[in-house]
């Protein structure tokens, strides 16, 4: 009788624990990931991408947005740009406006359901107005800083377009903005964002889970060379270089392999993964 009672108590405890435990995140094995190159920026100084890199060396960098499809959603990681004012500073080659670029992958601009913004720089947040029905996700601290303190005395807003900031505020007033509160947050089933790299005030990178998880780094890791040489990307301040390097190691750990960390501006992603035209099939 005592044995039966003991077994009953154990089974009851196990059942209670199972009910109380949070549901596991979706494995999201059905998510596909495509890199879409919407432009190329030629002859860019390598030393501005790899801190401590060789002076005088220049490379052509890819301007990229990433399309993630699954769970009934069309998700963009970053939105590119289109404002003419930036072309005089950064003469692009082979430019195709981001809303036109996603059509090459079979998605209409109004079919984009979500845009996850890695950071507020002009070439990553500058296309949010091109996708009229998308919910936009950005770190709460990134939003707070670049809609306020960045423009005060002592603030830093290099690379931030005031028109993009105004657009972000407008999207918020429309109810289409979601503010992410910090590190290691699942914002959609199987989609997590992580902070700590400090490319900007509160930049984030993205993990797409599944049997073979992938990390999309955006500018938190510009190039494969950053990963291979353990060298920092540009950061909010020089004091953040070490945190950037540490987060590159974290990206590899999250992805399970350096081969599944996709840098933000490296044209090699279109060679390392099956590609056709402007589109590389990451997964």
Where are these regions (language model features)?
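Active-site metal-binding loops of divalent metal-dependent hydrolases
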Residues: 38-39, 79-82, 120, 141-142, ...
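Bacterial N-terminal signal peptides
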Residues: 7-17
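Metallo-beta-lactamase
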Residues: 18-107, 111-123, 141-195, 211-220, 256-260, ...
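Cap/insert and terminal regions of metallo-dependent hydrolase folds
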Residues: 95, 203, 207-283
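Positively charged n-region of N-terminal signal peptides that target proteins for export
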Residues: 1-4
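Short, conserved loop/helix-junction motifs that constitute active-site signature segments
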Residues: 129-132
């Amino acid at each position: 009788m005592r044995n039966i009672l003991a077994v009953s108590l154990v089974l009851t405890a196990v059942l209670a624990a199972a009910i109380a435990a949070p549901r596991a995140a979706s494995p999201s094995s059905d998510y596909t990931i495509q890199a879409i190159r919407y432009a190329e920026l030629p002859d860019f100084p390598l030393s501005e991408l790899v801190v401590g890199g060789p002076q005088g060396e220049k490379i052509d960098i890819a301007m990229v947005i990433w399309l993630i499809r699954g769970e009934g959603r069309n998700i963009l990681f970053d939105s590119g740009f289109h404002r003419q004012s930036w072309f005089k500073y950064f003469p692009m080659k082979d430019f195709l406006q981001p809303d036109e670029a996603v059509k090459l992958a079979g998605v209409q601009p109004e079919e984009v359901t979500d845009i996850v913004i890695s950071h507020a720089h002009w070439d990553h947040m500058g296309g949010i107005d091109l996708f009229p029905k998308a919910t936009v996700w950005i770190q709460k601290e990134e939003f707070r800083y670049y809609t306020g303190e960045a423009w005060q005395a002592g603030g830093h807003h290099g690379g931030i377009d005031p028109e993009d900031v105004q657009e972000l505020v407008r999207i918020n007033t429309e109810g289409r903005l979601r503010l992410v509160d910090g590190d290691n947050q699942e914002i959609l089933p199987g989609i997590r964002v992580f902070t700590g790299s400090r490319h900007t005030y509160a930049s984030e990178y993205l993990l797409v889970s599944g049997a073979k998880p992938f990390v999309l780094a955006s500018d938190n890791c510009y190039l494969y060379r950053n990963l291979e040489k353990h060298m920092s990307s540009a950061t909010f301040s020089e004091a953040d270089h070490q945190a950037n390097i540490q987060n590159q190691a974290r990206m590899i750990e999250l992805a399970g392999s350096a081969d599944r960390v996709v840098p933000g501006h490296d044209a090699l992603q279109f060679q390392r993964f099956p590609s056709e035209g402007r589109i590389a099939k990451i997964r």
